[in-house]
Structures are given as C-alpha cells and as structure tokens.
C-alpha cells in the first residue's frame, strides 16, 4: 500500500535558527560524519562537535564564547541531520576552567549591572545545553573546574580522560558555585558530597568523579613506553585503605607520588582512547529512535531542570551584587597574583570584617596577594 501524498518527504524545510551564522571567537562548531558501531559512515548523518577553543587560558569562556556556545547548541538542536552533540575543549589540558578571570577582573569587577547582563548569557548557555533536542556528550579532555564543571554537569553524558581533574572554585576565588553546581551536584551525589565539593573547593580525580556518579566512563590517556597506563598520580589498585576508608581515586602521597610523577614525565598524553569511547557512545545513540530518545532526555533532565529553573534568577542577582565585594577581590587576586599565590589573605579579611571594617575603603587592596608579598 502506497503512503498518502501528505506524508511524502519535504523537499524544502523551514529554517528555525535564530541566526544563520553560529561563529563566535573561541568556539568551533563542526559536523563530523556519524558512524555505525562497526565504524562505517552513516551517509547524511552527523555528530555536532562544539569546541571551546581558548587553550592558552585553559578554555575559560569569554563573553563572546558564551554567546558562541548558545548559538552552537541551538544550531545542533535544530539540525535534522545531527545525531548527538559532543561538547569539548581544545588541547589536552582542560575541557573548561570556568569564566575568564582576566575578563572578570579587568571589566566586570565593580560593575554589577554589567555582570548581571553577562549572567543572563551564562544562564542561557546552561539552559541551551539542558534544552538541546539531541543528547549532549561532554568529552572531558582535561580539567573541568568551576564554571566548566557546571556546564559539564548540564550535559547528558560525560566521558573523561583519567588525567582530568574536577571541582569547584567559587568560595576560594570570590564567588559561589551557583551557576549549576549547587543545583546539579546534590541531585547527582547527595547533600554531603555536594557540600564538601562546593564549600571546600578541593579538586578530585576523574576516577573519584566516576565513583561519585557524575561520569559515564573514564579512559586512560597517558602512554608510557607505547602502552596506555592508568593515571599514576592517583590510587587505582585498591578500594580501601587500612582503616576502611575509600582509597580509590584519591591522590597518592610520599614515595608513591614521586614514582607517579616520574612516570608522568616519561609518558605522553594520547586522547585516542577518549575519542574512540566518545565515538562508541555516539554510535550507540545512533541506533535508537530519535523522538523516543529526545523524550527520554527530557524526562531524565527534569531533576536538574527543576533545581536550575528554581534558582537561576536569584543566583544571577546575587552574583551581580557580589561583584562589588568578594568577587572583585577574588578575581583581581587570581588575575594579578603569581602562579603559586592567587588567593587573598582569607584570615586577614575575616579579622577586618569582624572588627567592623567596611568594603568601602582600602580593604580590597589590603587583602591582595601583592600586599602579602610587600609586608
């Protein structure tokens, strides 16, 4: 039986993109051929790769880059020939380390209304990931820190190099991780682990991130003498220490750390296994009903979306006002400090606030790293 004419293929499509050009400095958008599980190409079908391309600043996103991600996610979502989205960073050092602290310190610090407008864009970037009609895979090629962790957790899947590190940075550098971390982490890992990650800002390994439940898979990325080896800086051979505490994924210490650093120096980074695992995941998604997959994504995103939509506008307002006080000082310290000294004098700040000193006046300068060095 022939299909009725009204169901025949359309030869001309409506264009649902807001703009025709997705290009913005620092963000690459490309469509790569989709492949079946056997490696053969699926003609006419693609995976959209969105790459944060600012490797000299660890793929931290500038204002223009935030715009670029929004446009790229929207384009990939609308593209009829796109199977899924791969969101990654350039190079092998970082997926993303969050907002560009140079831009924060030199333009947004002290300008709450400007930062409020910036945060509208940031919120739209996170929302564009959560609203994408295609599965979004975070290809974690290196550090996923601060805002980088937040946009990474907005994705549906995360496949990581085992050399990558994870964590938040807010309270250490003048902000609060309310661009997604305080929404997504409690959903994924529970209140206690979320509290420790967001308040203490201690980085953790990819193996620990996998164990916590915020990664789909972890693959080795270090080659030594031609063979892939697990990250030699973290414990991967035992689950517990002698006291029954978790040891897997924790940083090595003492002689074990020295040996691990020596192995790192002998090896080289190779992301081919990461790429193979990402392609494998894309191929598995290819062999699903597209509309059923989209509906499944929409349902599974609801816990994250409920928290995100409830809090994002309050977060935007608070972050803008915070640019007058702690954010101004924290981002300035990070931008102007040395590699090993990018934090304010936290104890001095607390002492001065306890004594009643106002942020209006010399407090900002007194707590900077350069003030500590001059003392």
Residue ranges of predicted features:
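A structural preference for short, pocket-lining loop segments at secondary-structure junctions
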Residues: 41-53, 67-110, 127-140, 157, ...
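Short amphipathic alpha-helices within nucleic acid-binding modules
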Residues: 58-61
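Hydrophobic alpha-helical membrane-association signature
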Residues: 65-69, 118-121, 274
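Glycine- (often His-adjacent) and acidic-residue-rich active-site loop
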Residues: 5-6, 10-21, 89-125, 144, ...
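C-terminal alpha-helix plus adjacent terminal tail
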Residues: 1-46, 80, 92, 205-207, ...
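Hydrophobic alpha-helical segments typical of transmembrane helices
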Residues: 121-125, 181-184, 193, 295, ...
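Crotonase-fold acyl-CoA enzyme core
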Residues: 128-147, 151-290
């Amino acid at each position: 039986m022939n299909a009725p004419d009204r169901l025949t293929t359309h030869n001309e499509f409506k264009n649902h993109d807001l703009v025709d050009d997705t290009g913005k400095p620092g963000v690459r958008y490309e469509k790569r051929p989709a492949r079946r599980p056997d490696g053969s190409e699926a003609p006419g079908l693609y995976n959209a790769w969105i790459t944060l391309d600012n490797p000299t600043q660890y793929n931290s996103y500038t204002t223009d880059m935030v715009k670029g991600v929004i446009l790229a996610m929207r384009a990939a979502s609308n593209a009829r020939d796109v199977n899924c989205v791969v969101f990654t960073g350039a190079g092998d050092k970082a997926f993303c380390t969050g907002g560009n602290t140079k831009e924060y310190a030199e333009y947004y610090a002290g300008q709450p209304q400007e930062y409020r407008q910036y945060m509208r864009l940031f919120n739209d970037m996170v929302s564009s990931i959560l609203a994408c009609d295609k599965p979004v895979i975070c290809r974690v090629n290196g550090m996923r820190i601060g805002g980088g962790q937040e946009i990474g957790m907005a994705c549906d899947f995360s496949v990581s190099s085992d050399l990558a590190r994870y964590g938040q940075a807010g309270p250490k550098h003048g902000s609060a991780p309310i661009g997604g971390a305080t929404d997504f982490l409690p959903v994924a890992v529970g209140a206690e682990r979320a509290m420790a990650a967001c308040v203490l800002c201690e980085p953790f390994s990819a193996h620990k991130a996998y164990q916590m439940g915020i990664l789909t898979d972890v693959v080795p990325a270090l080659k030594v003498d031609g063979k892939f080896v697990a990250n030699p800086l973290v414990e991967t051979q035992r689950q517990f220490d002698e006291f029954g505490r978790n040891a897997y994924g924790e940083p090595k210490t003492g002689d074990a750390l020295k040996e691990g650093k020596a192995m790192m120096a002998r090896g080289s980074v190779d992301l081919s296994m990461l790429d193979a695992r990402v392609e494998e995941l894309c191929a598995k998604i290819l062999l699903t009903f597209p509309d059923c997959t989209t509906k499944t994504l929409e349902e599974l995103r609801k816990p994250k979306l409920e928290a995100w939509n409830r809090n994002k506008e309050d977060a935007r307002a608070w972050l803008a006002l915070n640019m007058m006080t702690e954010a101004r000082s924290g981002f300035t310290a990070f931008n102007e400090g040395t590699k090993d000294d990018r934090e304010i004098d936290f104890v001095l700040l607390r002492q001065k606030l306890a004594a009643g000193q106002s942020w209006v006046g010399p407090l900002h300068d007194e707590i900077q790293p350069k003030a500590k060095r001059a003392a």
